[in-house]
Amino acid sequence: MGILGWVGLIAVGVLCVRGGLPSTEYVIRSRVAREVGDILKVPCVPLPSDDLDWRYETPSAINYALIDGIFLRYHCPGLDTVLWDRHAQKAYWVNPFLFVAGFLEDLSYPAFPANTQETETRLALYKEIRQALDSRKQAASHTPVKAGCVNFDYSRTRRCVGRQDLGPTNGTSGRTPVLPPDDEAGLQPKPLTTPPPIIATSDPTPRRDAATKSRRRRPHSRRL
């Protein structure tokens, strides 16, 4: 497949115009990736104009325990960030600014083991990623959204768009993306086969149902 084909699988989806209002979005799609080379072959996502909304078509919930690789493409103008699930053979392009911000917070978490080699490596990684993020300030928008607006996808225009599967927001329910028939982004994301891990919490209060069951197991005395 040529370079134009790869770009077509990842990048731009043009949405129809309703009611005279501009509704063009820059859709960044996930794709099939059976091996690392499938991700590295994909060209960088070019930065669109400032009047376009960015939307990352990722699953509504990602189980990070199933992620086999994280790619920060340093040479890309928008610091393309990709999560790879080798088992599902999927690569998800995610919001680099939100993901890297959380990643840097994890790297600076003080509760990590005070191992000298690990600490030096972690600090060096933090410095490199911090510099990569700071050098791309022109790609991010720092204009706050209006009160009561929650954007589920990154948008340089900071429009209150949200996800269509969570209900209409500001009249965007009529916008239908024009997707190629062979593009997997047009399909509904399948639920993960492995549920997310459940964190057990200690409960000092004894459970009444367990005590009731133990009492029921006691043998009853028979009267002669």
UniProtKB/Swiss-Prot annotation:
Asked if Nucleus is a keyword of the record, the answer is: no
Consequence when changing residue 115 to D:
In strain: Nonneuroinvasive mutant HF10
**Keyword ATP-binding included in the entry's annotation:** no
Residues of the gL alphaherpesvirus-type domain: 23-201
Q: Where in the cell is it found?
A: Virion membrane; Host cell membrane; Host Golgi apparatus, Host trans-Golgi network
What intrachain disulfides are recorded?
44-76, 149-160
Q: What ranges does the record give for the region Disordered, renumbered to this chain?
A: 161-224
Please cite one Gene Ontology biological process associated with this protein. fusion of virus membrane with host plasma membrane
GO cellular component annotations of the record: host cell Golgi apparatus; host cell plasma membrane; membrane; viral envelope; virion membrane
Annotated signal sequence is 1-19
Annotated membrane topology is:
Peripheral membrane protein
Keyword list, A-Z: Disulfide bond, Fusion of virus membrane with host cell membrane, Fusion of virus membrane with host membrane, Glycoprotein, Host cell membrane, Host Golgi apparatus, Host membrane, Membrane, Signal, Viral envelope protein, Viral penetration into host cytoplasm, Virion, Virus entry into host cell
Interaction with gH: annotated span: 20-161
Substitution effect: residue 90 to R: In strain: Nonneuroinvasive mutant HF10
Name the predominant localization.
virion
Compositional bias of type Basic residues: which residue ranges?
213-224
Similarity comment = Belongs to the herpesviridae glycoprotein L (gL) family. Alphaherpesvirinae gL subfamily.
Primary role: The heterodimer glycoprotein H-glycoprotein L is required for the fusion of viral and plasma membranes leading to virus entry into the host cell. Acts as a functional inhibitor of gH and maintains gH in an inhibited form. Upon binding to host integrins, gL dissociates from gH leading to activation of the viral fusion glycoproteins gB and gH.
This protein's assembly is summarised as: Interacts with glycoprotein H (gH); this interaction is necessary for the correct processing and cell surface expression of gH. The heterodimer gH/gL seems to interact with gB trimers during fusion.
> What protein am I looking at?
Envelope glycoprotein L
Its gene name is gL
